[in-house]
Amino acid sequence: IAVQKPNVAVDIILFDSEDYGHSDHHNSYCLGSQYWALNPHVPRYNARFGILLDMVGGKGARFAKDLISSFYAGEVLDSVWKTAASLGYGSLFVNEEGGGLIDDHYYVNKMIGIPCIDIIDYTNDEGFPSTWHTVNDTMENIDKEVLKAVGNVLITYIYNLK
């Protein structure tokens, strides 16, 4: 992106305090994204869409289509998954329904109204990876090929936007 600018602006936001509380208690969960949605870095900030990268580098990762993403940002979700399939990553970005996870993208959708999808290693049949929220959630469980695939999908998607 620094070498060849895409046709669209790209903002990167890093959220904190996602897992601080419980997802069924909005006053203790995803505090960083909730704060940002109510206090954006630029007054009256708006974006065409958002993509939340959530646990996108694990070995054996599979990304199903999150229900919250489908509800609020279905067009973006389908376009990203089609891009992945066209690049040969259909076994990674699986065309199946995932869970309806309350996560940072939920608050970006609900509170600031920016259509946002969640690319997350979660499927209905397997749930979260076995290393999720354990002391084994460490760098040796990261797969550089999975990270490369996700990066290739996003770069291709972004550079093909008009």
Where are these regions (language model features)?
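Acidic/histidine-rich catalytic neighborhood of metal-dependent amide-processing enzymes
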Residues: I1-E75
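Active-site-adjacent substrate-binding region
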Residues: F49, G58-K162
